[in-house]
């Protein structure tokens, strides 16, 4: 794949965004063929591989048929394939292979376009670690007073995606081919799932992820430039007030000031700090400004989606939250900002100045109740939180049982290492360790006391890695309850977060 992308940097068709000639290159479908076999089921016999009867002229004829098809004569790119497609040489296998080839070309082309976009944006950083988002929020968000919680719209008409592709694909044949594929993609969904037309189905996840990434890239290429213009339209008078960040809050909390003093003039001098983070479909825009400025920003977002993408976003997809008064949910954490008073002592020659600074403190909280619901669903405990044994694991070896509980414990503690409610995580640790002992006791037909006496201190440590000991040490009771440890190696969202996110989205949409 990397060689194919390096080849694209030299080829004129890539540089000029004329992609249609590349659809008929045989080496492209060699790559697509390998990707197709990688995602095929391992239970399929290897001697019935598609490579035994793959014909490149058949691929060419199929591409021409896709371009010439109408609604009454559908090729069936997105229909469920016959399980015996290798034996029957079903045409759907060729359709999926063509779809893989088209996706490879479009992915490489989009990667080249997005690389130029990111290089051209000053200050734009794309990071892989999820916890890097929390470190940014810890550093920057306390200086904001509003946050817009945005869910990117999902329901997208095929013609909107075609318009998106027209900005970086210049040849008409490629656009006609993509239009035919996208309309068939939309028609493959049922009426009740039409509003989630970009949710990846299991059969064509690669193509669906490409559509999602290209759509988000197009949104951000416009949105970031608008935010930067909005940021540069600030008032320059703010620079002459170095203590302006905390000045308003001091006025609110010092009662000796007369009531007639109004803070409206101070608000007019302030300009909005704007910070934008996104993971998946959830985006956060933190602003420091007046409520009117924040509402104006939301108004521009609605106009942005309607003007560029002809989308009417539901009101629940853009929420304005005041940081000092509410909790909000993001990436599996409940986030809040509580007001905190800091005493600063400054010594200047013979004088000692003492100043009180009122600042917002970032407080990420692990959703203990949702973790308990997930553990109840997976039968680690009952509804009341009492641990129970995993009878289905009694046929495993002792090391395998310890490894499974260790993996579950490590995933939870590693992901929520930055939360402040460590007492709740101690209880989660207890719930996971006790079922481990109960499962071993059921396997050996004994009691928990007998298992602990026979294994001693090695019961929960003989198969645990040093990484686990490091994680548990950060959650030891000798550690400060306010201390946070963010892990920069987490590049994938936790399965608990996905489970809780679905419940949270359903509650919002009601």
From Swiss-Prot:
Q: Quick one: where is this thing mainly located?
A: plastid
Q: Name one GO molecular function term.
A: RNA binding
Query: GO:BP terms for this protein?
Result: mRNA processing; RNA splicing; tRNA processing
On whether Chloroplast is a keyword of this UniProt record, the answer is yes
What Pfam family is a match, any one?
A: MatK_N
InterPro entries given for it? Answer: Domain_X, Maturase_MatK, Maturase_MatK_N
Record bears the keyword Cytoplasm: no
Annotated Gene Ontology cellular components are:
chloroplast
Q: Print the keywords alphabetically.
A: Chloroplast, mRNA processing, Plastid, RNA-binding, tRNA processing
Where is it located?
A: Plastid, Chloroplast
* Family statement: Belongs to the intron maturase 2 family. MatK subfamily.
Its biological purpose: Usually encoded in the trnK tRNA gene intron. Probably assists in splicing its own and other chloroplast group II introns.
- Identify the HAMAP family for this entry: MatK
Q: Which PANTHER family match?
A: MATURASE K
Q: What is this protein called?
A: Maturase K
